[in-house]
């Protein structure tokens, strides 16, 4: 994620510069960011005092620990998804000061922003989400299952689009390749399918209570594959991260942000993921508790 996402994106963000990276294996630092100061841990990087803000893209089990270190140093912090290892740690993350931000980068897709603008805050809607793609990269340390690797973006997307909290989840399918979910919202419902496939598919459809199409997009595989090969192409991963990092800079300077999620958003997302696991085991609907 850092090598293929954040580092290319950072080069396009005005007023930002990569000054340090951390990894237990220093050779990886030198490969992805040659000439940049390298440290063996987030703690070493933070204690060196080289940075004005930090992106935490460590394994989820380390997110809370590293975010607390960054918070103690007063650093604006962006935590990659999943926000934490579980709901309890997500709640603790939301208590860190200054409040960390969360890398739900799908919010910065211009098509998603356009669709969200068409949905009134009190609307009852039905969302259909269908997102499949081949594996884009291989993590060094962790091998998250689909609920951890894909679930955070998709649950957040449902919440953010509809401005409505998730109340319960039913898992219709959960395999190593595909997840299918039915989601009940305070105002409406959603159907989500996501996972791995031989070709790309990115489709979102939003309808009102009468069944009328409000907005969405449908990007077939060949078009999406070509678009994402364009450096800085519209809605490429790097471009989504540019928007996210620009928001982080605004936040660091005390200015209003465009769409950046906070650690408070991470709590209901992790709660929905845990509910999906409960439902997968029971075959029944699972409630999503409210923690804030």
Predicted regions and their residues:
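Short, Asp-centered acidic motifs that coordinate Mg2+ and/or phosphate
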Residues: 20, 52-53, 126
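C-terminal helix-rich "cap/oligomerization" subdomain common to oxidoreductases
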Residues: 53-56, 250-292
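A contiguous active-site-proximal alpha/beta segment in oxidoreductase catalytic domains
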Residues: 61, 83-136
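Hydrophobic residues in well-ordered beta-strands that form the structural core
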Residues: 79-80, 102, 215
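Contiguous beta-strand/loop segments that form the cofactor/metal-binding neighborhood of enzyme cores
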Residues: 149-221, 243-255, 292
């Amino acid at each position: 994620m850092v090598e293929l996402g954040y580092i290319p994106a950072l080069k396009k963000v005005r007023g930002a510069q990569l000054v340090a990276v951390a990894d237990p294996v220093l050779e990886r630092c030198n490969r992805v960011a040659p000439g940049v100061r390298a440290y063996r841990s987030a703690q070493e990087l933070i204690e060196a005092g080289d940075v004005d803000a930090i992106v935490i893209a460590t394994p989820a089990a380390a997110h809370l620990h590293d975010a607390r270190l960054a918070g103690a140093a007063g650093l604006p912090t962006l935590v990659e998804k999943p926000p934490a290892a579980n709901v309890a740690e997500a709640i603790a993350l939301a208590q860190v000061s200054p409040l960390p931000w969360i890398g739900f980068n799908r919010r910065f897709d211009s098509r998603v922003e356009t669709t969200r603008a068409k949905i009134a805050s009190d609307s009852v809607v039905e969302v259909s989400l269908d997102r499949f793609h081949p594996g884009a990269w291989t993590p060094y340390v962790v091998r998250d299952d689909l609920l951890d690797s894909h679930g955070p973006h998709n649950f957040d997307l449902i919440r953010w689009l509809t401005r409505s909290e998730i109340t319960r989840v039913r898992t219709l399918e959960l395999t190593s390749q595909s997840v299918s979910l039915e989601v009940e919202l305070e105002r409406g419902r959603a159907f989500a399918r996501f996972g791995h496939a031989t070709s790309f598919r990115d489709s979102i459809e939003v309808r009102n209570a009468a069944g009328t199409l409000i907005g969405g997009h449908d990007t077939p595989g060949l078009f999406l594959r070509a678009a994402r090969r364009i450096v800085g192409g519209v809605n490429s991963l790097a471009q989504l991260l540019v928007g996210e990092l620009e928001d982080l800079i605004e936040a660091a300077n005390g200015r209003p942000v465009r769409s950046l999620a906070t650690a408070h958003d991470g709590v209901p997302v992790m709660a929905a993921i845990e509910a999906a696991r409960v439902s997968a085991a029971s075959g029944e609907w699972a409630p999503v508790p409210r923690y804030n």
